[in-house]
């Protein structure tokens, strides 16, 4: 039996009341994109505070794709034990955007969803979410939505080639490679773009490392986090 008819949302759980300045529906995001005059919009999914590699990755994607803006779309639902609470992530991300991105190039919003850690399949689901919100590309990096070493490092990218039929989605993915802080260049780079570097020339950045530092009461160094962000964390 197939049933159809108008869809009515009864409520948005606690997300609308707990995060009134951040939670937005897909239609509200589409309306905001239209009001800003953006045509090409890159989405960045995050469950962590954004460290320097995340920041630079957004900048790289915008430049490479000649995008009008980027949607930083944070997850507001349940995470793993030890993850940073949503209100702290929200504050730190907005602070980073205010200090380090040009005006009217970034939209910070959140959505009501629990992290599933389903790796490649969740990456496809994330792409559908951002397509519904009006984005044209989604950044998919190493081990997107992964947990431990369960999935291959780039399975969340190759699933779009192997399992998603051509034309099934109206959104493309921006494939991010390994990123790291270059001691030589004093900035974050994609490691494949720095062939003259040795392993010692890089500082590897990760959300796990940041969480471990914070758990020990250590402020992340400037290679990891902007000082304004580290102060909030």
What residues fall within each predicted segment?
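Active-site cores that bind ATP or allylic diphosphates and position pyrophosphate for catalysis
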Residues: 1-49, 53-233
């Amino acid at each position: 039996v197939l049933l159809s008819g108008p869809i009515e949302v009864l409520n948005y759980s606690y997300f609308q009341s707990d995060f009134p300045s951040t939670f937005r529906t897909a239609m509200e995001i589409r309306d905001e994109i239209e009001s800003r005059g953006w045509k090409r919009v890159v989405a960045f999914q995050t469950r962590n505070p954004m460290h320097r590699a995340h920041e630079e990755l957004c900048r790289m994607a915008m430049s490479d794709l000649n995008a009008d803006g980027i949607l930083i779309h944070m997850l507001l639902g349940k995470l793993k034990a030890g993850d940073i609470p949503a209100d702290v992530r929200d504050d730190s991300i907005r602070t980073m955007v205010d200090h380090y991105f040009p005006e009217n190039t970034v939209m910070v919003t959140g959505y009501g969803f629990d992290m599933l850690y389903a790796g490649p399949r969740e990456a496809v689901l994330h792409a559908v979410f951002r397509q519904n919100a009006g984005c044209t590309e989604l950044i998919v990096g190493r081990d997107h939505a992964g947990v431990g070493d369960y999935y291959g490092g780039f399975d969340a990218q190759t699933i779009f080639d192997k399992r998603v039929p051509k034309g099934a989605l109206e959104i493309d993915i921006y494939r991010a490679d390994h990123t790291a802080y270059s001691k030589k260049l004093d900035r974050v780079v994609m490691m494949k773009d720095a062939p003259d570097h040795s392993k010692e020339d890089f500082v590897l950045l990760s959300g796990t490392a940041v969480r471990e530092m914070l758990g020990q009461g250590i402020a992340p160094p400037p290679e990891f986090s902007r000082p304004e962000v580290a102060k909030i964390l």
